[in-house]
């Protein structure tokens, strides 16, 4: 049986991920948690623009309805 999306997120816990949001925003950070709505918690988060870091954050919570994809 194929992995379900939440199974893939579970396997990506405590590893670096890139999260693409609506409006072409991207964040990179260590995935610390998620829920069934795909709300995400990232540590050491950075906002990327055209592959370059434009802002650094500590921990961030990303609302799941803004997520386009999560790349482990």
Curated annotation (Swiss-Prot):
SMART domains: Sm (SM00651). It comes from the Archaea. GO terms for molecular function: RNA binding. GO terms for cellular component: ribonucleoprotein complex. PANTHER family: SMALL NUCLEAR RIBONUCLEOPROTEIN, U6 SNRNA-ASSOCIATED SM-LIKE PROTEIN LSM7. Belongs to the snRNP Sm proteins family. NCBIfam families: PRK00737.1 (NF001963). This is Putative snRNP Sm-like protein.
């Amino acid at each position: 049986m194929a992995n379900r999306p939440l199974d893939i997120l579970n396997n990506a816990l405590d590893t670096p991920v890139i999260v693409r949001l609506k409006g072409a925003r991207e964040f990179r950070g260590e995935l610390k948690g998620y829920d069934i709505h795909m709300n995400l918690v990232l540590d050491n988060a950075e906002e990327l623009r055209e592959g370059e870091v434009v802002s650094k954050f500590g921990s961030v919570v990303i609302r799941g309805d803004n997520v386009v994809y999560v790349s482990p």
